[in-house]
Amino acid sequence: MAAKGARMIIHLECTECKNRNYTTEKNKKNDPDRLELRKYCKFCRKHTLHRETK
């Protein structure tokens, strides 16, 4: 059987309202630190910083 890949599904949480708005994949070997992206939050109705959660 083939080995399982290094890519994991992560959730992105808005830093202002704490809602988990996005899911994405990342490679844990290439990017061991937490991901931070500025994305649109539909609850805040503006672009905010979203951080990776478990």
From Swiss-Prot:
GO terms for biological process: translation. One of its GO terms (cellular component) is cytoplasm. Keywords: Ribonucleoprotein, Ribosomal protein. SUPFAM superfamilies: Zn-binding ribosomal proteins. Gene3D superfamilies: Ribosomal protein L33 (2.20.28.120). GO terms for molecular function: structural constituent of ribosome. HAMAP family: Ribosomal_bL33. Belongs to the bacterial ribosomal protein bL33 family. This is Large ribosomal subunit protein bL33. The gene is rpmG.
